[in-house]
Regions:
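Hydrophobic pocket/interface hotspot
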Residues: 23, 27, 48
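Short, polar/acidic, helix-capping and beta-turn segments at strand->helix junctions
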Residues: 130
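Conserved GNAT acetyl-CoA-binding A-motif
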Residues: 113-126, 135
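Short acidic N-proximal helix/loop "leader" segments that mark the beginning
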Residues: 1-6
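Acetyl-CoA-dependent GNAT
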Residues: 14-17, 36-95, 106-108, 112, ...
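Conserved acetyl-CoA-binding loop-helix of GNAT-fold acetyltransferases
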Residues: 98-113, 134-139
Length: 139
């Protein structure tokens, strides 16, 4: 399926405490599927939110018409001397795939990474079967 341009009403903004339930709903459906993240499929809400909303992570949500349809984290790459390399993780809500949400979050995260002084972006753990993500990251 070809990715469509995001809705003109799509807003990407910093996370708010009130977004927690929406982020958990997205996170839970993504990890339960088990085909995009190297995280335990049975991970509970508390450890999942501790992982995603961890201090040092810059967290954003994609919202359209008052509904959170995606979320991403931006952080220093955790590997060794890679503090000048950014790492991101993205999750899109079920039913919002193929609508440009992931692409919009990717472009936003690249802008944020540049603004923070990162020199490059590294994507860790992109499953080869995640066709949409692989195509996006290859562009």
């Amino acid at each position: 399926m070809e990715s469509k341009e995001p809705s003109p009403n799509l807003e990407i903004r910093p996370v708010r405490p009130s977004d927690r339930a929406a982020i958990w709903a997205i996170f839970e459906s993504v990890i339960r599927a088990g085909d995009t993240y190297a995280l335990p499929r049975d991970m509970g809400e508390a450890p999942a939110m501790a992982y995603w909303l961890k201090s040092g992570h810059e967290v954003h949500v994609a919202e359209t018409q008052g509904r959170v349809v995606g979320t991403y984290i931006l952080r220093e790459n955790p590997a060794g001397g890679g503090a000048d390399i950014a790492n991101c993780g993205y999750m899109t809500a079920q039913g919002s795939e193929g609508r440009g949400v992931g692409r919009a979050m990717c472009m936003h995260s690249m802008e944020r990474a540049r603004a923070r002084g990162f020199r490059a972006m590294q994507y860790n753990f992109v499953a080869s079967t995640n066709d949409r993500a692989v195509r996006l990251w290859q562009q």
